[in-house]
């Protein structure tokens, strides 16, 4: 038997030996979002007959950027409210207070998000009445006491 001295072949013609650790496409692209899973969803969803190799990488990068942007703003909103945990209310405040994200997610309803605080200026008390109450009377009138005759 001649095969006793040679290394066995395996894995479709490659030489035997220790197998290399597989590197995911997410790692190659430097992303946290799963490129392979997004590619599978693109194919399974039948959005097109064929899906290019760069499409899931690009889509994963875009989704990761949007998620990071929303989470950063929501974290700021949580910190402003002196909280350490992001809740749906913070997500709503973050998205609605940002002009571009507000346009992108205009038709989205956030469960348990509440509403933006907004009071119509007509309903607010008049500023002139506040100023008149705070200002002291003129010193010439306020400083003099009535003279006794």
Swiss-Prot record:
A motif (SPKK motif 2) lies at residues 145-148. Residues 1-25, 127-149 are annotated as: Disordered. It holds the Pfam family Histone_H2A_C. Gene3D superfamilies: Histone, subunit A. PROSITE patterns: HISTONE_H2A. One of its GO terms (molecular function) is structural constituent of chromatin. Residues 1-23 have a biased composition (Basic residues). InterPro entries: Histone-fold, Histone_H2A, Histone_H2A/H2B/H3, Histone_H2A_C, Histone_H2A_CS. Its main location: nucleus. A motif (SPKK motif 1) lies at residues 138-141. Residues 127-138 have a biased composition (Basic and acidic residues). It is found in: Nucleus; Chromosome. GO terms for cellular component: nucleosome; nucleus. Keywords: Chromosome, DNA-binding, Nucleosome core, Nucleus. The keyword Translocase does not apply. The nucleosome is a histone octamer containing two molecules each of H2A, H2B, H3 and H4 assembled in one H3-H4 heterotetramer and two H2A-H2B heterodimers. The octamer wraps approximately 147 bp of DNA. Contains 2 SPKK motifs which may interact with the minor groove of A/T-rich DNA sites. Phosphorylation of this motif may regulate DNA binding. This motif is reiterated in both termini of histone H1 and in the N-terminus of sea urchin histones H2B, but its presence in the C-terminus seems to be unique to plant H2A. Belongs to the histone H2A family. Core component of nucleosome. Nucleosomes wrap and compact DNA into chromatin, limiting DNA accessibility to the cellular machineries which require DNA as a template. Histones thereby play a central role in transcription regulation, DNA repair, DNA replication and chromosomal stability. DNA accessibility is regulated via a complex set of post-translational modifications of histones, also called histone code, and nucleosome remodeling. This is Histone H2A. The lineage of its organism: Eukaryota, Viridiplantae, Streptophyta, Embryophyta, Tracheophyta.
